C-alpha cells in the first residue's frame, strides 16, 4: 500500500457509503474504482454526483435481488459494482438535450451518466431514461459542494453533489414491504362505486354515438318521430289552452312510439334484427344492470322537454277565472305577489315546537341549505324529470337529516313548517308546474316508493297551506311577515322613534309576562339575523340599548350567545367588531362576561365563522378589548388562511395605532401562555410566513427577538423561499431591518433552497425597480453593506472591496459579477474580464504569495452546462472572490482593487498589450537596481536565508496539509454526526405511537442538515495552503537560480584559469599587439591578486597573450563573455527576487497569523450562530414532545 493509500485509509469513514467510496477510498487505484476516479480527477467540473440518502444505502436492498434468497444491500454495491457507481455520476459539462418552456420557464435537460445512461432533469425532479431497467421519478432534495480531502483528487477541488431521495436503480425495504397489507374490501368497494358512476353517466345518445350499427337501425325513425312535421303529435307544438291530462297522454304516446322503434329493430321481419339484437346484448354485458327503457325515456324527454315545458307554463299562467271547473290541476297559487307578501316570514312564526336557541339555529341552517338546493329548480340547465326529482329529494333530505346527538324530533309538522320557509324564500316561479312535471313525466315509477310519496305529500300540504283554500292561515302568515318587515325596516333605517314606539307597545302588552316565541321581537330573517343583529349592523347604539339594557329580560343569555348569522356563522360580537361599532362591542362583551359561565365565555369568544375566524381575529377593530378578553381568546386558532388572531393583528398595516396594537396583543399572549409554552410555529400561514415575516414594524414592542423564552427562527424561509431579512429588504421595512440585524442568530448570507438567492440578490432586484422610496432605499443600502463590512471583512486600515451577487446576461451569454467598495463605489465585470484582471494582478506581482489565477477558477468551469445549479456555482465563485479580496486586504489592497472598479475604458486594449506593459514595468524595476555585483559570500548568505526559510515553510506546509484534511473531513463528519443523531431521534419519535405526523415531520432528513461551519473554515486553510505553495514556488525558483549562478560561477573560474595560463605564456608584443581583456570587455582592469576575491570583475584582469594562441584565446573569451552576461543577469534577478521574496516571507508570516485568526473568528461566529439556532430547534422539538405526551395522556 502506498503512503497515499495509508493516509487515506486512516481518515474517518463517512456515514454515506457512496460518498465514502469515492472520496475516502484506500483502493482508489484498483477496480472497480480506478477508471471512475481517474475521469473525475482529470476534470471534476464536468461531473455531478447524484447521492442517495445514507439510510437508504444502509438499510435497503438492490431491487434486482428482491425475489432472490441472497439479497444485496445497496451499500455493498457502492464498493463492488462499477456500473452502480458510474450510473450515479452524470456529465454536466455537456448536455444531451436542453429545452425551456417560454411561459412557465420550466427547463428540462437530459444528461448522460458515466455509464452511458440518460437522466432527465425537470422541475426539481430527476427521471430515469435510456439505459435504466426501471423508469423512476425522484425528487432532488438539495445540492452542494463537497470539498475533497483525499490525495488522488486535485488539491482544493470541490465536487457538485445532488442529494436525491432514492437510488437511481430503485430500492426496496423488506420490512416496509411486509407491512403493506392490501385493502381488498376497500378496493372492491371503490371499484363498485366507480362502475356505478360510469353506468349512471351512460345515455341513449352516447350509445348511438358509440355503436354506429345501433344508430343506423333506429336513428332515422327517431328523427321522424321528433320532427316538427310529424302531425301525429302536433298537440305538443301548438300553444292553445288544453288540459294537463292531454299533455301527459300525448307525451306517453310518443314514449310508447319510441319503445316500439326499439322493439321493431329486433323483430324477425327486420333484416338487421339479429345484428341489432346482438349489439343490445353486448351493451348489456358491458354495463350489467343498465335500464334501457329509462335511457329511451330520457332520450325522448331530452328531445321534447322544451315543448312540454312551454305547454305547462302556458296552461299554468293562463288566467285562473274558470280553472277550478275546467282543470283544477292547472291552478297557480304561488304568484310573485304571494311571494312578496311572505318575504319577511320568520321560522318562529310557523308553530314549530322548538324553542331552544341552538335548535333554532340548526333549523335555520337547514333551511338556508335547503333553499340553496331548492333554488336549482329555476336553473335553465335542469331539463328532465330525473334532475328535478333529485333536487326535491335532496331538499327534503337536507331538512330531515339530523346530526348525531340531536335532541329534537323531526316530525311531519316540523317538516311542513320548514318546507314553507324553503318555498316562500326560494321564490320558485311556476313551482306547481315543476311538481306536476315530476309526478307525470318521470322515467321511474314511484308509486311503490314510500319515501318519495311522503315527500310529495308534504309538498302538497305546503301548497295547500299557502293556497287561498285556507285564507285564515295564509292571512296570519302575511300579517307576521308585514310586522317583521315594519320592525326590521325601522331598525335598518335608523328610525329610533318608530322603533321606540313599537318596543314601548311590546313593553305595555307584556308587562310581567313572557314574550311569545312567535312574536316579531323574536323573529329572525332567513340568514338567522335577529333585531339585535340589525341594530348592530345599523351601528345604532340607541336601538341596541333599548333592546338589551332597557329591557334585559326580553332576551336570555342563551339567546344572545346563539344569536348569529347562519350564513357567515358570525356572532353578535364578531359583527360589532367587523362593522366597527366599538360602543356596542364593548357593551356586548361586558354583558356576556357578566352573565355567562367561564366555559360559555371560552366557547363563545372562540367559536369560528365560515372563514374560520373567531372574535380574536376581529379584535384589531377594537384593541382596547384585548386586555379584557386576552385570557379567553385562543391565540393559536387558525382561520382558513392559517392566520391566527395574533397573525391577523400583525397584518393590520393600515391601523392608526399599530404600535399599541402590537404591544397589547403580544402582552396578552405572553401573559396567557408564558415561558417557552408559546409555540410560534402555530402562527405560520399557508404561505409559510412567520410572525417575523408579516410584522410591519415595532419588533421591540412585540419582544419577538428580545424575549429569551421565545423559540423563534429568524432565518425561516416561507414557501416563496424568503427569509424575514430578504422580505424586509424587498418591501423596504427599514425599522424591522435595523432590529433584525442586531440579532446574533441571523444568518445574513443565507441562500434560499430553490433559487440560491441571498440578501444581495433581493437588494439588486429592488434597485432595478422604477419607483423606489429614495431615502428609505439609501438607508437600507447603507445598513446591509455596513453590516457586511463590519461582520464579514477584517478590520484593516484600507479600502475594502467585496463582490455582491451575479446576474446572467442573455445577450452576452455571460455572468456579470457586481462589486462594491467600502466607499460606496460599485461596478460589475464579466467572468471573462475577471479572469484577465486576476491574471494581470498576478503578472504584475511575481514572486509573491498571491494565488495563481487557476486556483480562483479551480471549481468553476466557464463552459460548464449546469442549469439547475449554475447560480449555486456562481455564488461559490463569489465566495472565492471575496476570499481573494480578503487576502489582498492584508497587502494593502487599494492598488489591486482599482482594477475591479475601473470603467470600460480599458476594454478596447488587448490582453497582449497588458502583458507587454506588465513586462515593461518589471524590466523597469530591475533596471532601477543599476549594475548589480554579487559576491559568492553574498550568494551564500542569500542561499542560507532561503534554505532556512524554506525548511520552516515546509514544516508549516506539512502541518497545514494535515489541518486542511482534518477541516475538510470535519465538515462532513459534523453533518454525519447530526444526521445519525436526528435519525435516532426520528426512530424514537416513530416508535412512540402517540406522536403526530406533524411532530414527526419536524425531524429533518439528511439532505436538510448540511449546516456544518467547517467548510467555511476549510476555505481559509486552503487559501493559506495555496498562498504558501506560491511562496514556496518563488523561493524554489530563486534557489534554482542560485544553483545556476554557482554553476556559471564555477565555469567562469575554470575559463579564467585557462585564460590566465595562456596570458602567462604569451610573449610581449612591442608594437602594441598584445592580447588584452581590457580591449575585449572595455571594463577597468582588475589585478591578478584580486581574482581570488571572488568578484565578477576579477574575471577581466588579462595579461599578455602570445600571438600564436590568439584563436584559442578568442574562443574562450567569447564563451566566458556569454557566461558573464548570464551571471550578470542572474545577479539582477537574484537580488530583485530575493528582496521581493524576503519581503513576502516576512509579510506571509504576519499574513498567516492574521488571516487564520480571521478565519477562526469567522468560524467561531458561524458555529456559535449554528449552535444557537440548532438549540432553538431542539428545544422546540422537546417542547412539542412534552406537550404531545400530555395531550396523549389526557
UniProtKB/Swiss-Prot annotation:
GO cellular component entries: early endosome; late endosome; plasma membrane; transport vesicle; tubular endosome
Organism lineage: Eukaryota, Fungi, Dikarya, Ascomycota, Saccharomycotina
GO MF annotations, alphabetized: guanyl-nucleotide exchange factor activity; SNARE binding
Name this protein carries in UniProt: UPF0507 protein PICST_55861
VPS9 domain span: 324-475
GO biological process assignments: early endosome to late endosome transport
Domain of life: Eukaryota
Alphabetical list of InterPro entries matching this protein: Ankyrin_rpt-contain_sf, UPF0507/Ank_repeat_27, VPS9, VPS9_dom_sf
Sequence similarity: Belongs to the UPF0507 family.
